[in-house]
Amino acid sequence: MNNTPREIPPEQSLIEYPCRFPIKVMGAHTEEFVTAMVFIAKAFEPDFDHATVEKRPSKGGNYVGLTLSIYVTHREQLDEIYRTLTSHPLVKYTL
């Protein structure tokens, strides 16, 4: 069985580019985590405003969910953002 993701042709994509795309990322509830995620967002969108980051702490307060709405221009850029976030050592999950 082949587990490689197949490419979705642009005409079949549900996302219309360019757009502001909300990315949810979860990690430890620390300022270091938030700062690192904003730094990554700014690497892809230099004008990214950290004040737009939505924060939702977990019930126990140990973790925080962030929503980063990043302006993306094409699918490859969105894929690269996800790869960068998921490879960061402070990130637990991305959606």
Predicted segments, located by residue:
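Long, contiguous binding/interaction regions
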Residues: M1-G65, Y71-L95
